[in-house]
UniProtKB/Swiss-Prot annotation:
Residues 1-156 are annotated as: Disordered. Residues 58-69, 140-156 have a biased composition (Basic and acidic residues). This is Uncharacterized protein HHRF1. Residues 1-26 have a biased composition (Polar residues).
Length: 156
């Protein structure tokens, strides 16, 4: 008996009995607790992407649903806001204010980028387009077929 006790030490049955009577903890529940608190798998320890669903553009119809009738009413949806006028300055400011009020540093400080529209006939605004806009001349991005704006002054 003593040798077997040394190989596989069992707690004194009377002791565990009094424990379960006083605390309601039985050997079985203790084992279950030990199982559930075993070391978690590395997958569950990876940092979770909590904010995945915050990437939706706020209160703007996404361009994909532009001309499809809504399922419930069958009514035409409002046309999606154009990419260039999606976030005017006041809207962006209010967005930042909302985020600051919520106190979540995880949300982006600037509004999410406007998605390219599937139906948009114009090219996406590019760096060149923006530069032209600041210069006052609104042009389409024609980098691939560029002609120099002015003739080079010929040195004679």
């Amino acid at each position: 008996l003593q040798r077997r006790q040394g190989q596989n030490p069992q707690p004194d049955p009377s002791l565990s009995d009094t424990l379960s009577r006083t605390t309601g903890v039985t050997d079985r529940s203790r084992a279950k607790y030990r199982e559930s608190n075993a070391t978690p798998s590395p997958r569950s320890q990876a940092p979770r992407k909590v904010l995945r669903f915050f990437t939706v553009v706020r209160d703007v119809d996404l361009p994909r649903s532009e001309n499809r009738p809504s399922v419930r009413t069958g009514a035409q949806k409002q046309p999606a806001v154009r990419a260039t006028e999606r976030f005017t300055a006041p809207a962006a400011d209010s967005y930042r204010r909302d985020v600051r009020a919520a106190g979540t540093s995880a949300l982006p400080a600037s509004p999410p980028r406007a998605r390219p529209s599937l139906y948009s006939p114009t090219p996406r605004p590019t760096r060149l387009w923006r530069a032209n806009r600041t210069a006052g001349a609104l042009q389409v991005d024609d980098r691939h077929s560029r002609v120099p704006d002015r003739e080079e002054p010929s040195s004679t």
